[in-house]
Amino acid sequence: ALQRLSAVGLVHTNGRKGTNVARLTMPQLLDSFLVVSELEALAATQASKRITKEQVSTLWTHQKDCEKAFSANNPDAFCIANDLLHGTILKVSGNWMLQDYMRRTLILAPYRRHITFQPGRMEASIEEHESFIRAIESGNGLAAATCMRGHVNALADGLSDFLYFLDQTGLSEIIASKE
């Protein structure tokens, strides 16, 4: 299990020092969000060309689950529904290499989760989801990519608020120091 986690970058094995949860430096974190933004934009573009009516229905179901989680003020349920929504788009893209690269971005999950908990982020995500789902549904790859890129970049924009939160709560150790 640790080898699988290490393969996707979620843990680092340091010989006799043992295995530790991976932490990203600030430049690595910013670079990672930039790459994820482009990968998800590509997934949205390809999904807009390949999606079926049943898959569109699945996207809207996940979106409704996000709305319910927001209404219930349940960020955990929101994160699950959000992951299912994004995962469905990735699957619909049908691009095995893109799917493989996206698995490598699992290292960002804890950071994305903390950003999602920031005030106003869930509500904004719901509106952003509707925009890229409509674009995918209509087959407009350019609009789908633009909307998705904006959605993921909004997470990176929320990074400064997240960093302030970490500093104020004393949780800044989840960010790696330069080595």
Question: Residues of each region from the PLM?
Answer:
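C-terminal regulatory/effector modules of DNA-binding transcriptional regulators
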Residues: 121-179
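Alpha-helix N-cap/N′ positions at the starts of helices
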Residues: 16, 39, 61, 124-127
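Conserved amphipathic alpha-helical segments that form helical-bundle/coiled-coil interaction surfaces
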Residues: 28, 32, 53-114, 127-134, ...
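Mobile beta-alpha loop/short-helix "lid" or hinge segments that flank ligand
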Residues: 7-12, 105-107, 121-123
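Short helix-capping/hinge motifs at transmembrane helix termini and TM-loop junctions
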Residues: 48-49, 94, 118-119
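Short amphipathic alpha-helical segments at helix-loop
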Residues: 17, 24, 47, 70, ...
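Short linear motifs at protein or domain termini
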Residues: 1-45, 49, 160-179
